[in-house]
Structures are given as structure tokens and as C-alpha cells.
Amino acid sequence: MLMPKRVKWRKQQRGRMKGKATRGNFVAYGDFGIMALEPGWITSNQIEAARVAIARHIKRGGKVWIKIFPDKPVTRKPAETRMGSGKGSPEYWVAVVKPGRVMFEVGGVDEEVAKEALRLAIHKLPIKCKIVSREEAKVGGEANEGV
């Protein structure tokens, strides 16, 4: 599971997800990628499940790039605990994703294999996504028109 080695502060506020992604909104490394169409939190378990789904489908052929990292701790209080007595302890880590963000990329395999692998990975993620190619997502602004 992905998580930071060290953090300056153990707990964070929830924050809000406004607007579109301004960075990471084009396919930079591979030939095809998964682009988020709505905002959301993606846990480290979901990232790992999507990575495994892609890796199993492309076998040893291509390469997978994970372009998001879960750096936000989500806290949880124990069950049947009374209100108050402070914020709960960190339970898991999430990556904050905005619309237009390319989360995974695949390269080194042919188009059918890459698209099927990414389709399997999309089913592991909690937000709406679409598969984009390097040509479609060349300019971040143009690719985000449908977002």
C-alpha cells in the first residue's frame, strides 16, 4: 500500500475539491491513460487494486505508471465511542483527484490490450473515468472539454 514515509502533521482537515486539475492532466509517459471525470478521494487500496488489474492483464509486456499518490490521511474514531475527546486516529490514506487528472498510464503494449487493461482498472475506482490516448490528451485544455 502506498503512503508517505514521513509527514509533517499526522492529521489533516478534509478540505474541498473545487475546479479542474491544473497539473497531471495529459498523458506524459505512456500511450494510454485513465482520466478522472469527477472529483473524489482514491484510497491506497483502490490504487493498488487498479494497478494489480492492469498488471495482470498486460502480463510482462508493457509498463504501468501510477501518477497519483495518497498523501492525505483520513481519520476515524473507534466504533461505539462517545462524541468529543478529540479527532480520531489516522485510518487510511487517500489521493485527492480532480476532474481532468490522468491517474494511470500504460505503454509498450498494443491498443486493444491497453484499453482492456485500463477498462478493468476503471472498475476498481470509485469515480467516473475515461480512457484517453496520448493524442487526445496532448493539450490539457482540449482534453478537459468533456470533463
Curated annotation (Swiss-Prot):
CDD domains registered for this protein in UniProt: Ribosomal_L16_L10e (cd01433)
Keyword Methyltransferase: no
MF (Gene Ontology): rRNA binding; structural constituent of ribosome; tRNA binding
UniProt cross-references to Pfam families, sorted A to Z: Ribosomal_L16
Any GO CC annotation of this UniProt entry: cytosolic large ribosomal subunit
Gene Ontology terms: biological process: translation
PROSITE patterns xrefs: RIBOSOMAL_L16_1, RIBOSOMAL_L16_2
Record key words, sorted: Ribonucleoprotein, Ribosomal protein, RNA-binding, rRNA-binding, tRNA-binding
HAMAP family listed in its UniProt record: Ribosomal_uL16
Function, in words: Binds 23S rRNA and is also seen to make contacts with the A and possibly P site tRNAs.
NCBIfam families according to UniProt: rplP_bact (TIGR01164)
Family of this protein: Belongs to the universal ribosomal protein uL16 family.
Subunit structure: Part of the 50S ribosomal subunit.
Protein name: Large ribosomal subunit protein uL16
Species name: Caldicellulosiruptor bescii (strain ATCC BAA-1888 / DSM 6725 / KCTC 15123 / Z-1320) (Anaerocellum thermophilum)
Primary gene name: rplP
